[in-house]
Amino acid sequence: MTPNNNVMFDDASVMWIDADYIYQNSKMPLSTFQQLLFSIPSKHRKMINDIGNPACNPPSCSFPPSNSTVKYMVDIYGAAVLALRCPSLFSDQLLTTFTANNYLSYCNRQRPCPQPPCPQPPFDCAQTQILDALEKLARQSDLVVNSLNQISLNQSNQFLELSNTLNTVRAQNAQILAALETTKDAILTRLNALVDDIKAALPDQSAQLQELADKLLDAINSVAQTLRGEMNNTNSILTNLASSITNINSTLNNLLAAIEGIGGDGGGLGDADRQALNEVLSLVTEIRNILMGTARK
């Protein structure tokens, strides 16, 4: 590559390259190029106007103003960021021979070798200055290229890791959604089956339980009625027996009183007869007390 009118040099001898010139030769999509251009730090990128631009003075600006359009200029660092995005023969020449030839042309214009006191070939002095400048430029270019390669490699690795992570998360989300759908369908199926079973089983069981409850209630009522009748009969028998015993006791008392009256009148009952009657009275009284529940313990 030979020097052309797409570069300019500022007061610090920093070379600035037209970004449009790099875009036209890099064969890069416009959106990608613009994204890279605006990602370059501002100290390595500047915007100038072709007409009336104080930064483009006749001694240092190598290309003439053409119109009033705005141009973006980048230094060697910015040019490396743009050119190394898609490595090609142009990017290799841009960062080597293109830069060297433009600096050589700039040095020949801006730093003429003073005439020495003694006659010496002017080529030797200019060659020494050019070689020193080129050596410094080569070292700076190597550092810039190495830094950009490392940055590009790190960014590529980070993008790859991020892409893999996103793909993994996407796959896990798909698996989770599928599992949730399967679980939901299974739960709904089981619930529907359970509801159907309950609806089918509860009416029969309710009728059976009601029938058994009615039978049990009838049996309990029958037993209670029977027991109630038996108890009433037993109570009646006991009441009648107690009344009979009371009547017997009254009869015996009357009989005893009559017998004692006879004995008081000088009747024929002796002590032995009287004792036998008393024993009969005691026995009947004891039987009555037992039947009426008043027996002595």
UniProtKB/Swiss-Prot annotation:
InterPro entries: Baculo_PEP_C, Baculo_PEP_N
Listed GO MF terms: structural molecule activity
Subcellular localization, as worded in the UniProt entry: Virion membrane
Keyword Membrane assigned: yes
Entry keywords, A to Z: Membrane, Viral envelope protein, Viral occlusion body, Virion
Chief location of this protein within or outside the cell: virion
GO CC terms: membrane; viral capsid; viral envelope; viral occlusion body; virion membrane
A Pfam family of this chain: Baculo_PEP_C
Its biological purpose: Major component of the polyhedra envelope.
Recorded family membership: Belongs to the baculoviridae PE family.
Protein name: Polyhedral envelope protein
Protein's organism: Orgyia pseudotsugata multicapsid polyhedrosis virus
